[in-house]
Structure formats: structure tokens, C-alpha cells
């Protein structure tokens, strides 16, 4: 209910609006104030209420929720589209459907844009696209991370090819910024058509479960063309892109969870490729490593099972090596490999680890591509890479071969061999065959290679090797009527004792040290300090030819 006082105030405001004299300084200021107020709610309060009714925030509220309080500086708030086709000239909301600007997160500068689905459905037109291009170029020029909050429905059809041209400019800027500044995309609604390619070109994609979707063609088009019936969530929801496509790096439980994840993610990343990632002050330990062991360090000595075929959770190793939290990336995708960020001695590191609880830690197509992308991300932004290895090989099967395990597995080889950041490898158990080479071997350019006494470094495991190495002996025994199974077990044990251990590799320098598991954190810490001034020189080239 509106009071008499409120009605009087509103009448006064309307009177003021009608009597603004834009030929005076006071009038010009009043006109600016009016336009700025209008830009806050370009399509009215009803649209805002509808957004809130869905449990969502508006484009502007999302920026406020992510950035430090009162840090946002808006750009192009008064921009309007210039199109007159299809009666668009009768509706020209301020901002044209996207809020752009810059601010801070934990005191660090970032550039940002947030798409507004209440304005033309969040569709991209000429001015909308120009605003995004402008803030992209500002981020590149100033060396600041760029965060895009996406909630739009493709190109603005009424504006025709100009929308497609702006998409292309946005995509090109994503490419130019790649490896120069961190680019993070949050998907907060249904992103379709051209709206999905820009996020796909960025470093990290965060989605919200049951709220955000990404797809090129929607369910209606798919049904018309192929006859398939699928919901938006099944087609392009957060779970789909986390577990199946690998497009999403994190599936948030809600919008605030997504913002919290971005804030934590940025704490591990530098503002650009010319600087180092932020570190926390941590005093270097004094004295020998064995005099600085913690209870968590000592727990590593009993973590590996006696049986080489019994799995263990590699997360148990990771959490005991890091200072505090482990920020896992793509946790729901290719779970046979674990990647993410943490800190050791206050320094950010990227962890790449085989996971014995999934496919026994074997590398497959998805795991290879997941790890390769993460390794390249770390290398872009000067983050040391720590490999934790327990890999019996590449996953066998016709499905893997037909779908390109040779070419796609080579991506991890390429990414690791090309990386120039400090590279440290710890072999916890199995390191067999070609997978040993891929997972940070000495001759692939690893700087410091460590192995636990439980490490098994060989061309293949004992059960497979016996059939090759002792083929003639087994055949003769079979012809003589001997117990083949008993002989095979004895030969397997002989092979394991001779070759399946870390000491042959250590004798030849493929392993720099065989260490107690409890000493691992200390060794990694000293290696990181040593490699801080690592100098890497690569042959001059335009760019390499990654096996895409």
C-alpha cells in the first residue's frame, strides 16, 4: 500500500522528470542520473521479479555477488542498439542486454561481462557484441583475467549477419587471449547456438546443476531432424557436460557455489602469463626432511596395499602432500585421472594423478585429453606440474582403438613434452610401457623424478611379460607334462624380483631418488625451490602441430 507521502514523492519525481532543463548544468546532471537509474532495470521491475521467481539473480546482481563489495565499475551502461529492422527501433533498452566492466576479486583486478536474459532473451546483437569485444580487449591490454557470465539464447535474428560478425570477433579475441590471461566462463542459463563457442574457447567452464544448459541445436530441432526426443537437461545440462562431454570443469549446486568456486580458482592463477601465480608466505623447513615429518606424512608409508592389484584412492595421497585444500578440476569426467590445483610450501601446483580405483588407473582417450588440457593450462600460467603415477598402461579395447587412442593419447605426450614449467614426477606404484613415458618420465623432460619403494617400473607387468620372456621354457614344460600354472607363478615372481621395482631405473638415472613415501612432501618442496629459476629454451617455431 502506497502512503500519501510516497505518492507525493512520486509525483514530485514525475514533475522533476518533465521539467528537466538539459540546457543547464543541473539539468544535465539530472538527465544523467535519470538515464543511469534506467540502466539498472532496462526492461522494468516485472522482469526482475520473474528472474527472482526462478531462484536466479539478475545479470547485475550476479556481478555484485562475485566481485568484492562496491568494486564494480561499469562500462557502456548507456549503450543502445542501432537496428530498426522488424520494429526494433521502438524498443531500445539501455545496455542492450549485457553488463560489462571491471572490478576486483579478493583485491585482484578482473574484467567481467554478464549477459541479461531479460533483454531480447539475452540474444547477441551488434552493440551487445561490441560491448563484449571492448571488455575482452581491455582485459588483454591490461593483463587481467576475464570472467564471462553467460545466459543467452544465440544470435539476435532481427539484426542478421551483423550478429554473426560480432560472434566471430568475440571468438577471435578468445583465441588471442588464450594463454595470455585466464578466461573463465560461468553458464547461468540456457546457452545455445553461437553462445556456446566462446565459453568452449575459454580456460574453465562452470555450470549450475539443473539451471544451466549448453547445446548447439536444441531439443525441438533435434526431434525435427533426427526424430530423437530429449530434454534440455539431458541434452546439455551440467551433469551431461561434466560426466559425458567433458565440456564443463565444475558443476555447481547453485549460483553462489559457482561464484565461490571461481573465487577459489582465481586464487591459484596469475593475472596473466607474464607473472607468477599468487603464493602464501610459508617458512622453508630447516634441517633434514626426516626431522620435519608430520603425522600425515607418516601415514603415506602405510597407504599402498601389499597386493599390486588392490586399488587405493589417489586422493588420499594428494591431500597428504598439499598445504590445505585441493581444488579438483573436472572431477566427474574421466575419473581414472585426477587433475586440480593445490599448494605445497605456499606455492601453487597443478596435480596430475592416475586413479587406481577407476580402470586400475589406465589411461584412456578421455583421461589423456583431460590431462593434456590441464597440463597446457598449467604451462600457460607458470604453474609447476606434479605427476603422481600409478598407471598399468593404456586401456585396451576396440572401442579405444577405433576412436583414436593413438592420436588422442599422443595429446598428453605433446602437452607434457612442450611444457617448460617445473615438472616433478612421483611414481607411487605401477609405471608400465608407453604409459610410463606419457606420465612424466625423465626423458620426456621431467626435472625431478622420484619413486617410492613400492614403484614397479617396467615395459609391462609380470603376468604379461612371462608369456613373452619365458615362452620357450613354458612350451617345453608343457611338452614334458609339468605343472604350467605353478611354473608360471614362479617365473612371475622371478621377473618381479628382477625387473619390476624402482632400482633398475634408479641405477640408470631414470629415477633421481627412491624415497620413503613419508618424505615426498619434503622432496617436492625442495625441488620447487630449486626449480624456481628454471630456464627452458625451445627451438624457434611459429607453433607446434598438436595431434588434434
UniProtKB/Swiss-Prot annotation:
**GO cellular component term of the entry, any:** acetyl-CoA carboxylase complex
- Catalytic activity reported: N(6)-carboxybiotinyl-L-lysyl-[protein] + acetyl-CoA = N(6)-biotinyl-L-lysyl-[protein] + malonyl-CoA; N(6)-carboxybiotinyl-L-lysyl-[protein] + propanoyl-CoA = methylmalonyl-CoA + N(6)-biotinyl-L-lysyl-[protein]
Q: In which pathway does it act?
A: Lipid metabolism; mycolic acid biosynthesis
Compositional bias (Basic and acidic residues): 7-21
Domain of life, per lineage: Bacteria
Q: Which top EC class is given?
A: transferase
- Which residue ranges does the record assign to the CoA carboxyltransferase N-terminal domain? 25-281
TM annotation in the entry: none
Q: What is its EC number?
A: 2.1.3.15, 2.1.3.-
Pfam families registered for this protein in UniProt? Carboxyl_trans
* Region annotation Disordered: where it falls in the sequence: 1-23
All residue ranges annotated as the CoA carboxyltransferase C-terminal domain in the record:
295-541
Similarity section: Belongs to the AccD/PCCB family.
| Purpose of the protein | Component of a biotin-dependent acyl-CoA carboxylase complex. This subunit transfers the CO2 from carboxybiotin to the CoA ester substrate. When associated with the alpha3 subunit AccA3, is involved in the carboxylation of acetyl-CoA and propionyl-CoA.
Which PANTHER family does UniProt cross-reference here?
Answer: PROPIONYL-COA CARBOXYLASE BETA CHAIN, PROPIONYL-COA CARBOXYLASE BETA CHAIN, MITOCHONDRIAL
Q: This chain belongs to which protein, by name?
A: Biotin-dependent acetyl-/propionyl-coenzyme A carboxylase beta5 subunit
**Taxonomic source organism:** Mycobacterium tuberculosis (strain CDC 1551 / Oshkosh)
Q: Which gene encodes it?
A: accD5
Amino acid at each position: 500500500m502506497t502512503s500519501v507521502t510516497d505518492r507525493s514523492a512520486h509525483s514530485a519525481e514525475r514533475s522533476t522528470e518533465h521539467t528537466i532543463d538539459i540546457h543547464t548544468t543541473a539539468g544535465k546532471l539530472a538527465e544523467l542520473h535519470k538515464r543511469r537509474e534506467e540502466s539498472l532495470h532496462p526492461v522494468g521491475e516485472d522482469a526482475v521479479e520473474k528472474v527472482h521467481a526462478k531462484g536466479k539473480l539478475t545479470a547485475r546482481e550476479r556481478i555484485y555477488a562475485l566481485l568484492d563489495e562496491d568494486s564494480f565499475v561499469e562500462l557502456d551502461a548507456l549503450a543502445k542498439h542501432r537496428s530498426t529492422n522488424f520494429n526494433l527501433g521502438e524498443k531500445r533498452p539501455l545496455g542492450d542486454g549485457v553488463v560489462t566492466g571491471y572490478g576486483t576479486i579478493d583485491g585482484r583486478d578482473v574484467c567481467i561481462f554478464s549477459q541479461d536474459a531479460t533483454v531480447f532473451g539475452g540474444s547477441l546483437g551488434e552493440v551487445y557484441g561490441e560491448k563484449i569485444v571492448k571488455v575482452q580487449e581491455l582485459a588483454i591490454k591490461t593483463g587481467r583475467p576475464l570472467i564471462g557470465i553467460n545466459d543467452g539464447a544465440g544470435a539476435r535474428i532481427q539484426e542478421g549477419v551483423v550478429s554473426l560478425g560480432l560472434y566471430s570477433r568475440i571468438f577471435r579475441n578468445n583465441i588471442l587471449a588464450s594463454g595470455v590471461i585466464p578466461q573463465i566462463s560461468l553458464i547461468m542459463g540456457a546457452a545455445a547456438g553461437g553462445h556456446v563457442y566462446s565459453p568452449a574457447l575459454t580456460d574453465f567452464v562452470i555450470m549450475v546443476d539443473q539451471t544451466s544448459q549448453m547445446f548447439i541445436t536444441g531439443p525441438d530441432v533435434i526431434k525435427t531432424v533426427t526424430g530423437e526426443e530429449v530434454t534440455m537437461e539431458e541434452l546439455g545440462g551440467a551433469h551431461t557436460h561434466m560426466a559425458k562431454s567433458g565440456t564443463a570443469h565444475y558443476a555447481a549446486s547453485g549460483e553462489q557455489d559457482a561464484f565461490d568456486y571461481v573465487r577459489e580458482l582465481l586464487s591459484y592463477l596469475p593475472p596473466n602469463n607474464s607473472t607468477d601465480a599468487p603464493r602464501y608466505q610459508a617458512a622453508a623447513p630447516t634441517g633434514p626432511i626426516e626431522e620435519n615429518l608430520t603425522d600425515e606424512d607418516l601415514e603415506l608409508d602405510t597407504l599402498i596395499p601389499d597386493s599390486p592389484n588392490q586399488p587405493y584412492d589417489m586422493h588420499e595421497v594428494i591431500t597428504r602432500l598439499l598445504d590445505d585444500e585441493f581444488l579438483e578440476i573436472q572431477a566427474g569426467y574421466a575419473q581414472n585421472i585426477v587433475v586440480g590445483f593445490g599448494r605445497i610450501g605456499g606455492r601453487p601446483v597443478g596435480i596430475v594423478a592416475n586413479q587406481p580405483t577407476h580402470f586400475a588407473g589406465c589411461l584412456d582417450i578421455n583421461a589423456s585429453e583431460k590431462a593434456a588440457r590441464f597440463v597446457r593450462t598449467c604451462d600457460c600460467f607458470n604453474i609447476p606440474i606434479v605427476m603422481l603415477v600409478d598407471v598399468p598402461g593404456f586401456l585396451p579395447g576396440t572401442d579405444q582403438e577405433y576412436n583414436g587412442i593413438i592420436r588422442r593419447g599422443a595429446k598428453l605426450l605433446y602437452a607434457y613434452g612442450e611444457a617448460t614449467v617445473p615438472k616433478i614426477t612421483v611414481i607411487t606404484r605401477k609405471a608400465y610401457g608407453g604409459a610410463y613415458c606419457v606420465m612424466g618420465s625423465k626423458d620426456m623432460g621431467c626435472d625431478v623424478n622420484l619413486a617410492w619403494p613400492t614403484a614397479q617400473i617396467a615395459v609391462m607387468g609380470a603376468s604379461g611379460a612371462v608369456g613373452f620372456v619365458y615362452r620357450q621354457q613354458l612350451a617345453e614344460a608343457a611338452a614334458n607334462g609339468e605343472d604350467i600354472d605353478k611354473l608360471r607363478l614362479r617365473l612371475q615372481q622371478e621377473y618381479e624380483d628382477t625387473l619390476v621395482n624402482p632400482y633398475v631405473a634408479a641405477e640408470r638415472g631414470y629415477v633421481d631418488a627412491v624415497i620413503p613415501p613419508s618424505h615426498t612432501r619434503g622432496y617436492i618442496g625442495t625441488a620447487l625451490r630449486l626449480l624456481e629459476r628454471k630456464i627452458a629454451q625451445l627451438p624457434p617455431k611459429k607453433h607446434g602441430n598438436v595431434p588434434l
